[in-house]
């Protein structure tokens, strides 16, 4: 049972998230041969002030 965790900054539309789940599922199915029904995709959206790169929060850029 593949479980794929995707972390990204919030702000995508519901349609974009729907497509992300579908495309990730397709890729895992194709590359691993896993049964599509067993593939789980978990999306975690982060607030820009909860994520930083090189010591700077995304909300401060």
Curated annotation (Swiss-Prot):
Listed InterPro entries: 4-OT (IPR018191), 4-OT-like_dom (IPR004370), Tautomerase/MIF_sf (IPR014347)
Presence of keyword Isomerase: yes
Domain of life: Bacteria
UniProt name for this protein: Probable tautomerase SAR1376
Keywords (A to Z) from UniProt: Isomerase
Cited NCBIfam families: PRK02220.1, taut
Biological source species: Staphylococcus aureus (strain MRSA252)
EC identifiers of the protein: 5.3.2.-
Coiled coil: none
Keyword Transport tagged: no
Cited PANTHER family: 2-HYDROXYMUCONATE TAUTOMERASE, TAUTOMERASE-RELATED
Active-site residue list: 2
Molecular function as annotated in GO: isomerase activity
Family assignment from sequence similarity: Belongs to the 4-oxalocrotonate tautomerase family.
């Amino acid at each position: 049972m593949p479980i794929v965790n995707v972390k990204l900054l919030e702000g995508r539309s519901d349609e974009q998230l729907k497509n992300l789940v579908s495309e990730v599922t397709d890729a895992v199915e194709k590359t691993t041969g896993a049964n599509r029904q067993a593939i789980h995709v978990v999306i975690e959206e982060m607030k820009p002030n909860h994520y930083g790169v090189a010591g700077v929060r995304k909300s401060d850029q």
